[in-house]
């Protein structure tokens, strides 16, 4: 449905190659999650975000060894190397893409930019609204590890 409606970049939160291969079959780009999808769809897959659970497992095992409580609400990210990017598919990426990714990554780690940065407005499926002012951002996962962004951002196309 997304591709039919004109979406030219597909991503997913699944452990399946189906979005990547579907993107390739339809001539659109794909950004993976949890697995590098370049082998599955070399003409469509640009890059993937991945989680390094080894960092959490190491902390949990160390907590057990030390007789401490195992952390169950765990928040780590790019700066902690708990989230990382697979290598960029340089065979299909535009010139300068790696440099742009590196710059954005540095700014995210330093806190210079944020994922949900204002100004933006959104509405949750329950009708709750949020408005983030210029210069402010949504503080997701600072107090809990579960994703908490559930808003449809004003101006985004919703496909049902």
Language-model-detected regions and their locations in the chain:
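A residue-level marker of the well-folded mature domains of exported/periplasmic proteins
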Residues: 1-160
